[in-house]
Amino acid sequence: MSREDLSIAEDLNQVSKPLLKVKLLEVLGQGDFKHLKALVDNEFQPKDDPSVQQVLNLILHYAVQVAPILLIKEIVAHWVDQVGDEKSSSKSDDGIHLDLNYQDENGNTPLHLAAAQSRSDVISFLLSQKSINDCVKNKAHQQPLDMCKDLNVAQMIQLKRDDYFLETVHSLRAAMNKRDFSKLDSIWKNPRNLNLLDINGIDPETGTTLLYEYSQKKDIEMCQWLLKHGAEATVKDGKGRSPLDLVKNIKLPAKPSNNVTPEIKLKNLLEKNLREQAIVHEDVASSKPPTYKGFLKKWTNFAHGYKLRWFILSGDGNLSYYKDQSHVDRPRGTLKVSTCRLHIDSSEKLNFELLGGITGTTRWRLKGNHPIETTRWVNAIQSAIRFAKDKEILNKKKAVPPSLALKNKSPALISHSKTQGSLPEASQYYQHTLHKEVIQPSSVSLYRRPSNNLSVVSSEIQLNDNLTESGKRFVSKMIENRLDGSKTPVGVHTGSALQRVRSSNTLKSNRSMQSGSGVASPIDKVPNGANLSQSNTTTGSTASLSDNNYIDNFEGDEANSDDEEEDLGINFDRDEEYIKAQYGPYKEKLDMYEQAISIELSSLIELIEQEEPSPEVWLTIKKSLINTSTIFGKLKDLTYKRDKRLVDMVSKQGDVNNVWVQSVKELEMELSNKTERLASIDKERRGLKKILHKKLLESHATAGNKESLENDKEQESDTTASTLGQIAKFISATKEEDEASDADEFYDAAELVDEVTELTEAHPEISTAAAPKHAPPPVPNETDNDSQYVQDEKSKIESNVEKTSQKFEKQNNLVTEDEPKTDQSLKNFKAEDKESQVKEKTKEIASSVIGEKTIVAVTTVQKRKEEYLLKEGSYLGYEDGIRKRLSMDKDDRPKISLWAVLKSMVGKDMTRMTLPVTFNEPTSLLQRVAEDLEYSELLDQAATFEDSTLRTLYVAAFTASSYASTTKRVAKPFNPLLGETFEYSRPDKQYRFFTEQVSHHPPISATWTESPRWDFWGESFVDTKFNGRSFNVKHLGLWHIKLRPNDNEKEELYTWKKPNNTVIGILIGNPQVDNHGEVNVVNHTTGDHCKLYFKARGWRSSGAYEITGEVYNKKKQKVWILGGHWNEAIFAKKVVKDGDLSLEKTRTAASAGNGPTDDGTKFLIWKANDRPEEPFNLTPFAITLNAPQPHLLPWLPPTDTRLRPDQRAMEDGRYDEAGDEKFRVEEKQRAARRKREENNLEYHPQWFVRDTHPITKAKYWRYTGKYWVKRRDHDLKDCGDIF
């Protein structure tokens, strides 16, 4: 026979691998082991053929993807060898021996593929096999757990691995106690155990390593076994002791002797190990930062509870979390561990908290799936915190901290670190890899086996200042408490001193890898974006806010932020049906059918491409296509059933939600109706009391003429007596309610304001009475008709303002098409004359607006400040006066249900909400800050008083007065863009205001206001949440006032934090603003302080808007008390005796216009301005803020809020354009942020810097002093392009 004939014969006899795969898939889909065995016996011949062997080895790989669980169990029972099964080698009589951990071309084991398809029944069965190894990594460096898409399955794998670990540790300790070395060897030979156990771990019960324990017992044989299997003599225990310390004082004999003591043997053994380790690991010292990854449950909100999330602690010190492993390119949140501290409750075995962020307000409530897992995470995070702190020390002082010294190769550094008391954490004993980066024992880092994997160095694991006190107590007791609730038998923890330190590389790119075996590995389906490296784990998504620099470097904006993750992920406390709805019913079967079709078709293509079709091949192809068609039919039917079930579940859930919403709405309506009814009753009661009071006064007035009028008034007296009797009866009936009301402790503001008005009308001389003897002539208040200010001066001011306003009334205070030219005289100033001419020009503008000056600088510091404001041209451009009205007459925004939009945003931060533009008002949050200055006259008046406690009283009234403008203002202001600014000067009130948005996430506005008598600055920094029924706003920023009193040259510093705000009544469509909480206004110069109490809205309307307070001197004595309503008026009186500690019910003469009194009578401090009906419910003051006055526009920088297009369109009623512009400017902001991230640039504010206040020692935003100078010089054109 020729060679050509032999070649043809060989080709005919060669086994077709694609044909075998197609036939195998057909049989696996039938689920009958007898058919599978017949196929293998008849078709898979000869057994030694390479193609046959390849397909045989992959039987289990195909089975876990397309076969039912019963067939998989039979395959394992008949063909898979088990560890420790003596019959396993002989149970297969056909010579087939499958490896449960065999890896295909992509490195996937059957467990990998089952995990990728989330086949929980298959995974549970495989993990129950003795020979399984769930720590094997594929070529993408993923363990089976890393490939799970179903979070339920991932949690199951975690729990099973933890249970196996505890069981193995218990067995290992039992074998050690029995000195069963054969059992120890068998345990240690298991590859899975090598990945999970660390022989150098610390026993939590004894606090020592195994080698130290048996060295102390002088058990030479056991020490030899431990050293042979990787124990190291240099590893220190929980008290900083190593086995070498036990033998360091033993002296070796000068000459060898046959009579060697156990101590000498032990010393020789340990020193030999030390020499070997020094040689083997000479270059293995590790100084890599701690890394870790895995699943944890994170608390989101009350609506969704805990959700399982994928966490990664990266080497750059960032802890980030993701929805799952496939979304590692989109972190939902990031914390810099160097700014964090751990809080752990020793009574909790699974929960711990991470408190962090520069403000200390970030709070992550985390929960492990198992006590051991929680322990590992606690140690990993604590290790990372210590590493970051030590790195900072190293960078600043160029010194090696103790925790980093252990990583140095020099043995001298080991002893040094010991003297420094750098002790490892006892609880690191439980560290074993769980698909994660895992912690290394601290002392082992010097002599660790070489590894290409990223490892966690835990020399930092020790009690440190980053743990709270309860956390430190917990770490000390962690071991004894941690396993109490586990199902492991008692005594297991006594031997769990073994953990192999292993680590897995961070996730790499999971690009498609075509398997030559034809196994359609689900790893091919992982998105290409899942690429995470050590260097760029969280680049571009880190919210890193250092003390000295707030930066805009956060992934989320209000249009794409989802870190509160509502409606995402799984809450494992819910019922099974709801969990299935998240993934979809019949998911496992659908995945199996899809995978079967995919593999079948790929195998057919491979068969057609590689074979010349023969009759047998065509028959196989036909059967395969029929089988594929059958599977597709099942897939179609099951998909229809799934969709129908999902629709039913969604409809049912929608009905449940509607019932819930309707129930809550009805409850809100009922509460609202009761509140209105109580309010009407209360008003009626007050009216009757007023009638009674009036009748009594009339009866006293006519008492002198009683005799002469007795006959004429007899009938009227009877009527009066009858009326008074009825009134008295009504008042008696409501007496209990009246006495129970806290509101009656103080004057009702509305009632007393009416009384003051009546007094003023009846006695005009009150308004022109002399000022109190302890105060100089006060500053005019243009808004208070009942004040004590001089009437003719006030008339003069109003007259001048009115003239100036009428000058531009024809323009309706809007921008004209012909923009006025900038005053050329200012542009042509000579350098030497510029400041003086600017000063004169500023005086001229102020004079044109207010006429004769009404606020006179008295002291040197006041005059110096006034000169400073004039020199910098603070009022240039404000010649036009203030705007009195908007361009539109009424608010004609489209009506949209607020609840319909907000119901999907429960639990979210308000600043991250994306709402339709119609829910906005045409103001910015920067302008909302400016509204605090509406009643700045209170500060001017405070500076006139000699008494420091009285100054404190008026400053406190100023802090409360700003909330009068919040009533009816429930629309959302525009969120400022990063770098956006706003200026506002009032020549008539002699102050200038400036603010800048210095941070976007979190949103922070820094502000600075200056006036001759006072300065006002602070930061608008709030934490906001929507809980379904109300918006909650918590103010975090500290506010400051520097007052310059008229009576001395010493300035006074006041600070306070604003009360909390709540918007209620959202469900019933009647939103209202409520302010509540305690405010402490502190005078740091004199030691005086005022406590203000904003009362939360209760059942009765008389309790709404209520405010009370007390002023104390530096001796802690109460000097003044105040009360009223923050939306109407505030009154006060002086405490003249010990028992006079509140504003009592008894009416006394109220001073309407004379200001403070010292005799204990009540006087009016402040009264709110009138609120006429205006579009968007804006106040008259708010209307002035966004006015594009013609003379002002040329002076403004391009970042000023008045030039913002979306807000301007909103003000003019162009709502569609406003929405489009809002989207455009926010996209522009995001593009700028991405550009900064690409270039590794940090954002720095232009006009403010983060600093520490010399008096309060608190961080604050300090104004650099450059804005008004550049404005005066027309040097603001290049300050930024943000609109």
From Swiss-Prot:
Domain description: The PH domain strongly binds to phosphoinositides and is required for targeting the protein to the membrane. The FFAT (two phenylalanines in an acidic tract) motif is required for interaction with SCS2 and proper localization of the protein.
Compositionally biased residues, Polar residues: 504-518, 530-551
Topology class, membrane: Peripheral membrane protein
Biased composition (Basic and acidic residues): 707-716, 791-810, 818-834
Protein family according to the UniProt entry: Belongs to the OSBP family.
Chain positions covered by the region annotation Disordered: 504-571, 702-721, 767-834
Entry-linked InterPro entries: Ankyrin_rpt (IPR002110), Ankyrin_rpt-contain_sf (IPR036770), OSBP_sf (IPR037239), Oxysterol-bd (IPR000648), Oxysterol-bd_CS (IPR018494), PH-like_dom_sf (IPR011993), PH_domain (IPR001849)
GO MF term set: lipid binding; sterol binding; sterol transfer activity
Protein name: Oxysterol-binding protein homolog 2
Subcellular location: Cell membrane; Endoplasmic reticulum membrane
Main localisation: membrane
Highest taxon in the source lineage: Eukaryota
Domain PH: 289-386
Pfam families given in the database record: Ank_4, Oxysterol_BP, PH
Biological function: Lipid transport protein (LTP) involved in non-vesicular transfer of lipids between membranes. Functions in phosphoinositide-coupled directional transport of various lipids by carrying the lipid molecule in a hydrophobic pocket and transferring it between membranes through the cytosol. Involved in maintenance of intracellular sterol distribution and homeostasis. Binds and transports sterol. Plays a role in the positive regulation of vesicular transport of ceramide from the ER to the Golgi, negatively regulating COPII-mediated ER export of cargos.
Modification type Phosphothreonine: residues: 488, 783
Cellular component GO terms, alphabetical: cell periphery; cellular bud neck; cortical endoplasmic reticulum; cytosol; endoplasmic reticulum; endoplasmic reticulum membrane; nuclear envelope; perinuclear endoplasmic reticulum
Stretch list, region OSBP-related domain (ORD): 897-1268
Keywords attached to this entry: Acetylation, ANK repeat, Cell membrane, Endoplasmic reticulum, Lipid transport, Lipid-binding, Membrane, Phosphoprotein, Repeat, Transport
Biased composition (Acidic residues): 554-568
Keyword Ion transport: no
Residues modified as Phosphoserine: 7, 422, 445, 451, 455, 458-459, 486, 512, 515, 717, 787, 825, 1151
ANK repeats: 106-134, 206-235
Modified residues (N-acetylserine): 2
Statement: the UniProt record of this protein carries the keyword Endoplasmic reticulum: yes
